[in-house]
A protein has these predicted regions:
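Short clusters of hydrophobic/aromatic residues that line enzyme substrate/ligand-binding pockets
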Residues: 17, 32, 36-37, 80, ...
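Short, glycine/charged-enriched secondary-structure capping and boundary segments
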Residues: 15-19, 30-37, 64, 86-94, ...
């Protein structure tokens, strides 16, 4: 039994490098702190959502311990890529830019997330399912941290360029809104165990992945429109 979970079960990490690591790029990609979530990090969920995910992890392990069911648990960072439901940040903002709608940013956009291209996540699932150690846990991350506001600006620049808009034309759509309750400051996964034991590592640089993602949504606008209009529910 393969159980896919989230890094949110671990709680939150401190933002000890507010500007990130210069080696990671001008505004993203490098670590924003010294600590990372490992497979040994204690669970400390801060929201009902993450608490429910943590409980599901424990249920899976309990079934292995009690009944001997072969299990695997993975905890991954934020995914992005094609076919993501448009309530999620990246497809939502691509669609909002296309329709000239506001781009809502929680707080001041300083929260940090690690981003993983969905095809890299799928490759990790495949290798863990076939070669992972039964009853073990593996973290899957992109080693690719971005502040929300910096990520949004990358999306804005990419969409504007591909649509032929003047540079920075959609920056004015950024709208700061009240921060979300229980909004953890930083998530960052250490997936070196997965690389060391099973040889997996991300294949795409973020710049390539976000370019592919934006292009996909712009080239598949009918799919997005079908979802956002609710027409898909009539199937």
């Amino acid at each position: 039994f393969y159980h896919i979970s989230t890094d949110e079960v671990y709680g939150a990490l401190e933002l000890t490098r507010p500007e990130g690591d210069a080696a990671g790029g001008e505004s993203g990609g490098g670590p924003f702190g010294e600590e990372f979530f490992t497979e040994e990090t204690k669970y400390a969920p801060h929201s009902p959502y993450s608490a429910s995910k943590a409980s599901s992890d424990h249920f899976v392990r309990a079934y292995h311990d009690t009944y001997g069911m072969p299990t695997l648990v993975t905890n991954c960072s934020n995914n992005y890529g094609p076919y993501q439901f448009p309530e999620k940040l990246i497809p939502l903002f691509i669609n909002n830019i296309r329709h000239r709608r506001p781009l809502p940013v929680y707080g001041r956009g300083q929260n940090v997330r690690d981003w993983l291209y969905v095809e890299d996540h799928a490759r990790a699932i495949d290798v863990i399912f076939h070669r992972g150690k039964v009853a073990d846990t593996y973290n899957i991350g992109g080693f690719n941290e971005w502040k929300n506001i910096d990520l949004i600006r990358v999306i804005v620049r990419t969409v504007d360029r591909l649509l032929g808009n003047p540079e920075g034309a959609s920056e004015k759509l950024i709208t700061y809104v009240t921060d979300r309750a229980g909004h953890d400051m930083r998530y960052a996964i250490d997936s070196r165990k997965l690389k060391r034991e099973l040889g997996w590592q991300p294949s795409l640089q973020f710049e390539e992945g976000i370019e592919k993602t934006v292009r996909w949504y712009l080239e598949n606008q009918s799919w997005m429109d079908d979802i956002t209009s609710g027409e898909y529910q009539q199937y």
